[in-house]
């Protein structure tokens, strides 16, 4: 089954709502229409940018999707500072990132919590981008494949085959995020293939062949084509390189070159 690559920008805590509009406009202007037939392009933005991005994308009928970077596990109630999946759905979000290593490290989020957040998003028709990845010491010990497979299993607990068919998984080796270090294409393929084999076990071959697995971790325009060209890598979760609309457009265009 041919999987359309997904190139998703994760802006993290960058760009206010005015900068967000300018960045998406630049991205849309810089990426010719024919590329949208080859790759899906998305941005996951700070909560405060969502309404502005929604208005721009819907008003100009842009072929770009968008989403948030986190979601509450709760539906509603006395949870100060939290944002529910229903709120995100009302803002037209297609995606929400859950389990990013920065959430796991700085906010103590467990894989069990990540799974509950993913289910909360799915219940509102939002596709979760579930992030997994190993720290440097695990990579150096040579146990990274087993580590990531078990982390993925725990982060998908309670999700049905139908849920998994609407889910995206992003493999982000923690040692490569924001460091300039990039896993080789072979490294990315090794882990992404193991993740796909896990999905076969959990949900069957048909779901596994349709599910998109992204690579994240210092993805650049110069490296994206080789990585996305791997048989089990279906796009990228792009951090810093997505903050400039024109640069992100170039990266997406380069990813499209591997699509037949």
UniProtKB/Swiss-Prot annotation:
Keyword Transmembrane helix among record annotations: no
Record GO cellular component, one term: cytosol
Subcellular location, record wording: Cytoplasm
GO BP: any one term: glycerol catabolic process
The reaction(s) this protein catalyses: D-glyceraldehyde 3-phosphate = dihydroxyacetone phosphate
UniProt keyword annotations, A-Z: Cytoplasm, Gluconeogenesis, Glycolysis, Isomerase
Active site (record annotation): 100, 172
EC number of the protein: 5.3.1.1
Domain of life, per lineage: Bacteria
Main location, first listed in the record: cytoplasm
Record pathway: Carbohydrate biosynthesis; gluconeogenesis; Carbohydrate degradation; glycolysis; D-glyceraldehyde 3-phosphate from glycerone phosphate: step 1/1
GO molecular function, one term: triose-phosphate isomerase activity
Binding site for substrate: 10-12, 178, 218, 239-240
Listed Gene3D superfamilies: Aldolase class I (3.20.20.70)
Signal peptide location: none
Entries under InterPro entries matching the protein: Aldolase_TIM, TIM_sf, TrioseP_Isoase_bac/euk, Triosephosphate_isomerase, Triosephosphate_isomerase_AS
PROSITE patterns named among the record's database cross-references: TIM_1, TIM_2
Function: Involved in the gluconeogenesis. Catalyzes stereospecifically the conversion of dihydroxyacetone phosphate (DHAP) to D-glyceraldehyde-3-phosphate (G3P).
Record family assignment: Belongs to the triosephosphate isomerase family.
Subunit structure of this chain's protein: Homodimer.
Protein name as it appears in the record: Triosephosphate isomerase
Organism in which the protein naturally occurs: Corynebacterium diphtheriae (strain ATCC 700971 / NCTC 13129 / Biotype gravis)
